[in-house]
Swiss-Prot record:
This is Protein argonaute 5. It comes from Arabidopsis thaliana. It comes from the Eukaryota. Gene3D superfamilies: 3.40.50.2300, paz domain, Ribonuclease H-like superfamily/Ribonuclease H. A divalent metal cation binds at residues 721, 807, 947. It holds the Pfam family ArgoMid. The gene is AGO5. Keywords: Magnesium, Manganese, Metal-binding, Plant defense, Repressor, Ribonucleoprotein, RNA-binding, RNA-mediated gene silencing, Transcription, Transcription regulation, Translation regulation. Residues 638-958 form the Piwi domain. Residues 116-129 have a biased composition (Polar residues).
Amino acid sequence: MSNRGGGGHGGASRGRGGGRRSDQRQDQSSGQVAWPGLQQSYGGRGGSVSAGRGRGNVGRGENTGDLTATQVPVASAVSGGRGRGNIGDPTFSVASSSKTVSVASSSKEESKNTEVSETMSNLQITSTETKPEMTSLPPASSKAVTFPVRPGRGTLGKKVMVRANHFLVQVADRDLYHYDVSINPEVISKTVNRNVMKLLVKNYKDSHLGGKSPAYDGRKSLYTAGPLPFDSKEFVVNLAEKRADGSSGKDRPFKVAVKNVTSTDLYQLQQFLDRKQREAPYDTIQVLDVVLRDKPSNDYVSVGRSFFHTSLGKDARDGRGELGDGIEYWRGYFQSLRLTQMGLSLNIDVSARSFYEPIVVTDFISKFLNIRDLNRPLRDSDRLKVKKVLRTLKVKLLHWNGTKSAKISGISSLPIRELRFTLEDKSEKTVVQYFAEKYNYRVKYQALPAIQTGSDTRPVYLPMELCQIDEGQRYTKRLNEKQVTALLKATCQRPPDRENSIKNLVVKNNYNDDLSKEFGMSVTTQLASIEARVLPPPMLKYHDSGKEKMVNPRLGQWNMIDKKMVNGAKVTSWTCVSFSTRIDRGLPQEFCKQLIGMCVSKGMEFKPQPAIPFISCPPEHIEEALLDIHKRAPGLQLLIVILPDVTGSYGKIKRICETELGIVSQCCQPRQVNKLNKQYMENVALKINVKTGGRNTVLNDAIRRNIPLITDRPTIIMGADVTHPQPGEDSSPSIAAVVASMDWPEINKYRGLVSAQAHREEIIQDLYKLVQDPQRGLVHSGLIREHFIAFRRATGQIPQRIIFYRDGVSEGQFSQVLLHEMTAIRKACNSLQENYVPRVTFVIVQKRHHTRLFPEQHGNRDMTDKSGNIQPGTVVDTKICHPNEFDFYLNSHAGIQGTSRPAHYHVLLDENGFTADQLQMLTNNLCYTYARCTKSVSIVPPAYYAHLAAFRARYYMESEMSDGGSSRSRSSTTGVGQVISQLPAIKDNVKEVMFYC
């Protein structure tokens, strides 16, 4: 088997051609071939997470990254490959444990593309017989990898001006000094620490601190502009204790040791901003960030990078509002100092967060449980809910006139009237008696449990009506639907209103105060003005039998009038079950008749008669009804489900259908069934078509094979996401989902796989794994491998390119996620074929950022969509983007209400060598192929689908837990001993279609 043309990549390879490592034998490709019919290896480009890639792009200058083999998934280590290094990179190196090999490359010749027959005789794929690779992943390093440099800026599209909520920060040259702070006795509260340091500065600024005003992070670090008059010094500060009512108590002494650690200046920062240095000076950025956060940290409630306070609304009444059930929201803002092309910028955005209402605990319980009569004992289930929601809250003690406070550790299992405790003289007394005698207070709600403070071994019991929840305590539990609606309604702002709120915040916060001036910082009050481009929408192809065969969307929208699905599915076996008790008996028949008529009118083939007669069943018997349908109609293609009138059964239905019976289902709300609305039926028809194997539309350029770096070679586009449990669910696993396109060149059908992993683990663990099989021993497995096998089965092709859209990764995790997940991808590829190294473009998709783009002229219909937001297709890759790396903001959708949030795409690896225009156009065009509606969507569909699939799998897990179905679940143990409840397997026929839509 020939390896000419470059199978491996990485370290020591020569240009694009079939270069061979000097230490590599010529017959190194003798392993068992796992892709039957494949006679030659497929070229990938060098370095995996490209040790040699520097910024990993075609012809893009010199690599300055020096990555070790233990940190980077180098393909030669995985596949023994040779071939391409980084194309056009003049120099690159890979450091191994023993030596560093440097190779100079100037070859520009494109290697020949190996052709693969589209019809292959044997599609069964077996495991390789080579010795299995170690599955331990390389260690993560936050600075191990440098990412691709920007391949120039995009030029396509209509140029427009927009404003962004980024404010230019100018910094004068200063020497910055870092001091370690040690406060004794140690306290957990940042607030107390800050109060100690404020008093220290007040008392000693002129006498001992050389007149300097330091910036303090609330923990261990103090920063000054210029040196203090000492290297190390200890101070004594007497801080008056603050009572719960705000008054001052007795003084408490603190010893504060301040010791010089290091100093820096702004030279490295300027070098980075001038693009003369690759490594960002994060230590310097941290100092400046602490300076800008110093004042708000003292004045407001700090939550991550956000600040909240009731004074941050338009007026005193606007700063807070009720969400229901004893919860309220506070207005606030997000603040982050960022490195951008225009220099340092301060990203400011308005925000809101949920807090506990500062009310008496009995009032809270009345709201939280929606009960009026507090003279009755709580049910056990309600008592547990109250215990969970109140635990760790701080309360004022009203029988001490609010001067004392305590922390709730739990609530009693018995009503307070039944609680007794033993006195020092060994006599017993009830809590009710104690409060009557000690405080002359008669407990009002004696049927309620008592608030417990202190430990379980030495509990202190307090009547609920004498405990008032302290103000400013964050509510971290999941908001219910009513609360979410109330929060959205209160915080939803149209673009001009949001922009004005942001401007007012910047003025109110006065970032140019004395402390900022001392550090040489000044912040402009004007939003950044940026040149953006509006990319043209793609032409969409529909079936030739429709009146309209092609559509050019306008402002991110179109409709299905006179159009037919490009590939209508054929449904020959279907039926309907209704679990609603409120709809008329004959309505399911009429609804299904009209729904099927809609499906047929849009291009599907649908047998009019159901496989078995429709079933009506009370919601208490969902499982029995579904099992009966499966027994009476084996091989059912589609089950239309009319949901129960009360919410809560959707997850159970999906779990049973998709993991136990192998039934594809379409659930419909009874209120929608009642309406018989045509638009609703059209939307449902779109979902049914893709769930039964059809395609609604495709990009015309895909049909014409006119998408650069996609349609020229077999390409698989993948989306990946990890969803985490809600706060408070401490034992629930995180769920990873990976979807992959199964049709090339159309790239429209996405197969979905899911996997459970350790609680709040962001890195996807099951992309590649070795599984111990009782008969076969160690067997290659994992999500990537399974998708690749399915791709070949569906297309007869082997992917030569991978476009991997990864959702849900924060900036601090970029290197770690790339290193681990690229290692897994390379191992999965190598398990299918030695030296099989397809080229990978790895793109992070971010929606949870705070950059907002506003039209230059609000109300100008030529510059906005109908909602007043910037137009769909607006892309920004200048000024507010990274100074060096390949990233861009793309607003691909039309706004509905409020202010649109553009998606942020950041390229971590690009072995395919996309230009800015190519990747931006591809991403924008894909946003028009989302299957569930005739609108462009806000993030690229593969990432969107991965999110939907992971969210669907959460139902499987939640149903398992809520139904007590332990017999169905499996568990495994991680390397650190954590037991993970495994997801029930999705049936094969279900996961072959877009079941999650």
